[in-house]
């Protein structure tokens, strides 16, 4: 990493950094500089990988053009292999963009769920309330009252209540 810098130069840079930044800020500065260097290395590696991939694609295209000019019948094994790779790469690129028909892809429902309400016998409202006592629910005064400020309701945000924070 430090090809042109010797030990004495590194020591001098360290002493100057200690004098200029002080012992409190020097470790923070070193960490931030190392994170910048790591980010630049990552970026350089990603650019390098992209360039290599583009060059490989260009080589495959050149091989394909060469194969087309020769005719597809008498190809060398290397050219056949590169054509197959190119076809696979084209298919992998096209897969995410293919539109799938959701109506075609979903299977037909085999078991349909029928509503129990539709299958019940029609009765008058008076008969229904006698048959099902839980059908009418009256609001009780305790369930309608809001929570007091000293007792936050369950799941309430404690940041809005200063007593809960400290």
Swiss-Prot record:
Residues 69-166 are annotated as: Disordered. One of its GO terms (biological process) is protein transport by the Tat complex. One of its GO terms (cellular component) is TAT protein transport complex. Residues 88-97, 112-132, 155-166 have a biased composition (Polar residues). One of its GO terms (molecular function) is protein transmembrane transporter activity. InterPro entries: TatA/B/E, TatB. Its main location: membrane. The chain crosses the membrane at residues 2-22. Keywords: Cell inner membrane, Cell membrane, Membrane, Protein transport, Translocation, Transmembrane, Transmembrane helix, Transport. The Tat system comprises two distinct complexes: a TatABC complex, containing multiple copies of TatA, TatB and TatC subunits, and a separate TatA complex, containing only TatA subunits. Substrates initially bind to the TatABC complex, which probably triggers association of the separate TatA complex to form the active translocon. PANTHER family: SEC-INDEPENDENT PROTEIN TRANSLOCASE PROTEIN TATA, CHLOROPLASTIC. This is Sec-independent protein translocase protein TatB. It comes from Shewanella baltica (strain OS223). The lineage of its organism: Bacteria, Pseudomonadati, Pseudomonadota, Gammaproteobacteria, Alteromonadales.
């Amino acid at each position: 990493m430090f090809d042109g810098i010797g030990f004495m130069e590194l020591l001098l840079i360290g002493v100057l950094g200690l004098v200029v930044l002080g012992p409190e800020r020097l470790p923070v500065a070193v960490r931030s500089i190392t994170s910048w260097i790591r980010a630049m290395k990552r970026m350089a590696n990603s650019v390098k990988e992209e360039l290599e991939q583009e060059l490989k694609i260009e080589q495959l295209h050149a091989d394909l053009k060469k194969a087309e000019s020769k005719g597809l019948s008498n190809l060398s094994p290397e050219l056949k292999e590169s054509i197959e790779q190119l076809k696979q790469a084209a298919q992998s690129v096209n897969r995410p963009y293919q539109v799938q028909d959701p109506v075609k892809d979903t299977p037909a429902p085999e078991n349909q769920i029928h509503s129990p309400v539709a299958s019940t016998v029609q009765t008058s409202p008076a008969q229904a309330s006698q048959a099902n006592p839980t059908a009418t629910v009256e609001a009780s005064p305790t369930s309608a009252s809001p929570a007091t400020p000293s007792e936050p309701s369950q799941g309430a945000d404690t940041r809005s209540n200063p007593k809960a924070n400290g």
